[in-house]
Amino acid sequence: MELVLCFVIITISGVIRESSALLLRSPTSNDVFGELVASAERAQPLATRLTKRISRLNFNDREDDFWEDHGDASWNNSYTLVNGRTTLGSENRRRPASHSLIERPYYRDGRLSPVLGVQERRGRSVHSYHEEPVSFFDQRAFDEYTFRRRSQLHRQRARAGLRSRIKQNVRRLWTSARGAVRGWGRRVRRKIGDLFVGHLMPQLRRLRFWDQGLPPVVPPLIGNEPGQASVALVAERMEARLREKTLTEKNPTEAQQAVGTYLINSAENTWFISIPGGRYILLKKRGFLGGGGFGLVYHVEHPTTGQPFALKIFVQRVMNNEVGDKISDLIEDEFGVMKYFPPEWTPARMYSELRFMVPLLKLRVLGKPEFQDARNHLRIFSVCALFPKAQGDLEEAAALLADMDRTNAYNMRMSSTIQMVKLLARFHAFGLVHGDVKLQNFLVDKSGLLLLSDFTQILRTNERRYPPVVTVLYMSPEIATCLITRLRNAIPYTAEIDSWMLGISLYRLWCGDFPFGITLDATALQVAGIVIRSSASSLDFASCHDIPEQFREMIVGFLRKTPGVRLSPQQALEQFSLLNWKGPSPASDTASESEPVSTEEAALLQKE
């Protein structure tokens, strides 16, 4: 029952609402709304919507009349003239004077238009008037509008097609250009990156006030040896002679001139970078120390601290534009010595404790290529080896003994002999063979201690090598036999080969010349023939200066032709007590007998 009652109420409300709407829409002869609706119905297919103008102000507060749209669903909308007191529909009302509800046909805002709308006007005064209805539609204006509209659409389509083609072409060109620019940009960025990383960044890093290119710290040599004060005196004379040579040397060799021109110049500081590690080091060349077949050694130091170093530069003589691999292998051998020692032995520790002169760092001259060809037959490498600086080698020191008094000369030879034997025995304890023992490879420190150097030819004990490599004047009988008989079998390298070379070195230190009548200008075949024909018993010590009898026997043991009976450095330390010499007096040892060393003394020598 309640549902039926609700339905009846809703139905009655709808009927009342529709009746009110019909009253508002009923046209009369004098009704402005009726004429408006009639005109709008005739022009409905071409008419535009009337703008809905609704004021949200309070009607009771308004003084002027305005029009309210009751809907915009179609042109059959109902309109009501509203004033401040009442709202009326379908009645004769007064409208503003001189303001037409309908715009004039044909023109709107200065342009011809077939469809005219309705605009609302407000005036200050109102009065009753009658206006004939005006048609919304004009055929001529409509035809002109249709033609203009079609032409406009055609032009718009043409312009749209042209714009589309232009956009496609521009997009295609832009894609091609962008790809080219990206490729070019990548190459440019790569070049700029290489330039920045390789050249600008090192310069910027060097500009840092805390980075002064300091070289590594060289630890002092550990230990003392008897008679090293006399050796230090000779080292001081060697340093003075080196300074004099640096000041008076006016005619450098061709290789030295090429190094000064293409690699490092003494007139300016040179930046180096360590390999590996990338540590920047600033050094200044001070003078030339010496050179060999593939290297030149220079005295360098840090310009601020003055710490001295020895810099070895590798130079290869190239003949007929042919480049061999020997120099490259030699460079690798120079820095490959550390692989033969346990990892706990660093270069600084080996220098300080073992007294082995190994390169502290592998350097490369900053801003220089890997190598440079100078004067068509010299190849200069930018890779260098940095060593602690010594005063010179033992051959230079032996040449200065003639100008010294007998006591200091004797003490210097005694101390040098003991240190040479100990150094080589210490090296053999690692199971290695030096392969190039000679006076030039024993360096003299300013403290009077000797150091063993040049480890480019080292091998493990009993390791074979063919062809053998040796300094000609220090050739052992095994290598001489291989050279004379032209054997093509690899020769096993043992400690006995080093013992022969040590015997040659000691004989030259004490006697000033080579044994068996070998001369400095002898060829390899001549030396090989002399070594094979000679025997240790034929050694002549008549020209030797105050050599002790024990050292004569020791040199004879080192120069035995048969390797099996040849004396080794470790055996010499155990057999000859004079190697444990303590006093610096030349008269303290003139005995001819040779006393064996006791067990306690041998243990002490091994510890030393």
From Swiss-Prot:
**What span is annotated as the signal peptide, if there is one?**
1-21
Which residue ranges does the record assign to the Protein kinase domain? 283-579
- Report the protein name in the record: Serine/threonine-protein kinase ROP17
Question: What domain of life?
Answer: Eukaryota
The record's Pfam families line, in alphabetical order, gives:
Kinase-like
Give the enzyme's main class according to its UniProt record, as a single word: transferase
Q: Which reaction does it catalyse?
A: L-threonyl-[protein] + ATP = O-phospho-L-threonyl-[protein] + ADP + H(+); L-seryl-[protein] + ATP = O-phospho-L-seryl-[protein] + ADP + H(+)
Q: Sugar-bearing residues?
A: 76
Q: Belongs to which family?
A: Belongs to the protein kinase superfamily. Ser/Thr protein kinase family.
Could you tell me the keywords of this UniProt record? Answer: ATP-binding, Cytoplasmic vesicle, Glycoprotein, Kinase, Membrane, Nucleotide-binding, Secreted, Serine/threonine-protein kinase, Signal, Transferase, Virulence
Q: What happens when the gene is disrupted?
A: Gene knockout results in reduced virulence in mice due to greater immunological control in the host. Significantly reduced virulence in double knockout with ROP18. Modest increase in the loading of host immunity-related GTPases (IRGs) following infection. Reduced migration of Toxoplasma-infected monocytes and macrophages through the collagen matrix. Reduced dissemination of parasites in mice.
